[in-house]
UniProtKB/Swiss-Prot annotation:
Belongs to the TRAFAC class YlqF/YawG GTPase family. MTG1 subfamily. It comes from Bacillus spizizenii (strain ATCC 23059 / NRRL B-14472 / W23) (Bacillus subtilis subsp. spizizenii). The gene is rbgA. GO terms for molecular function: GTP binding; GTPase activity; RNA binding. The lineage of its organism: Bacteria, Bacillati, Bacillota, Bacilli, Bacillales. Transmembrane segments: none annotated. Its main location: cytoplasm. This is Ribosome biogenesis GTPase A.
Length: 282
């Protein structure tokens, strides 16, 4: 699956983020807890250099908790502080400022020693489209400042947002890389809704989702579609699901487009429970 999606505002955002790094103390890198590596932009490492960072594992309520813990340990072993959060209901957000203060304590101690008046922490939020940046900012600021939605790429300009007296945030548009070298990365992003459905082959995404469920969560797959066994042939599996879900055309033929929609919707709306689509050891 070849996907190339790099709107002009993203190229501009990369340049502006690089400039804004001089103004900020710490970076909050927001990733999808279900796909922590695939939802990291490889370019971000080049952009951020050695800036202090906290990895925010967002949508943790949708991810397999045991796998999320593995990811947290993985990042901690790399010297990157990580927090599990849910930007929708606010879970874990009260840890962000204390963790930031801890990381920046030496810097602020040096500033105080030089007689510099204490100020709010200045942070930059960065991440790919649809990972929840705007929702996080609105939740932290307790008001609807940033535009939110399920359409990837909805935040198109940068803005500073005050969060109480202790934190100032710089929001940026989601920065997605020009193309995906690894097909699995594209499929993981697609199945979680990080890429516009209009530019991907949805049947490929549904097949990926089914194969993943078959390998990692087979009992959930069988339970959801009332299957005694999971057919090895993917076409037979599609037929079985289409028949169980009534995705039929005239003459009793399976409507594969409708079946594809059902499968992807079931995955994205957690009908299979909490899923993690990659592990640190994968």
């Amino acid at each position: 699956m070849t996907i190339q999606w790099f709107p002009g505002h993203m190229a501009k955002a990369r340049r502006e983020v690089t400039e804004k790094l001089k103004l900020i103390d710490i970076v909050y890198e927001l990733v999808d807890a279900r796909i922590p590596m695939s939802s990291r932009n490889p370019m971000i490492e080049d952009i951020l250099k050695n800036k202090p960072r906290i990895m925010l594992l967002n949508k943790a309520d949708k991810a397999d908790a045991a796998v999320t813990q593995q990811w947290k340990e993985h990042f901690e072993n790399q010297g990157i502080r990580s927090l599990s959060i849910n930007s929708v209901n606010g879970q874990g957000l009260n840890q962000i400022v204390p963790a930031s203060k801890e990381i920046l304590q030496e810097k602020f101690d040096r500033m105080r020693a030089k007689g510099v008046k204490p100020r709010a922490i200045r942070a930059l939020i960065i991440g790919i489209p649809n990972v929840g940046k705007s929702t996080l900012i609105n939740r932290l600021a307790k008001k609807n400042i940033a535009k939110t939605g399920d359409r990837p790429g909805i935040t198109t300009s940068q803005q500073w947002v005050k969060v109480g007296k202790e934190l100032e945030l710089l929001d940026t548009p989601g920065i997605l890389w020009p193309k995906f070298e690894d097909e699995l990365v594209g499929l993981r992003l697609a199945v979680t809704g990080a890429i516009k459905d209009s530019i991907i082959n949805l049947q490929d995404v549904a097949v990926f989702g089914l194969r993943f469920l078959e390998e990692h969560y087979p009992e959930r797959l069988k339970e959801r579609y009332a299957l005694d066994e999971i057919p090895e042939d993917i076409a037979e599996l599609f037929d079985a699901i289409g028949e169980k879900r009534g995705c039929l055309m005239s003459g009793g033929l399976i409507n594969y487009d409708k079946t594809t929609e059902v499968i992807i919707r079931d995955i994205r709306t957690e009908k299979f429970g909490r899923l993690s689509f990659e592990q640190p050891t994968m």
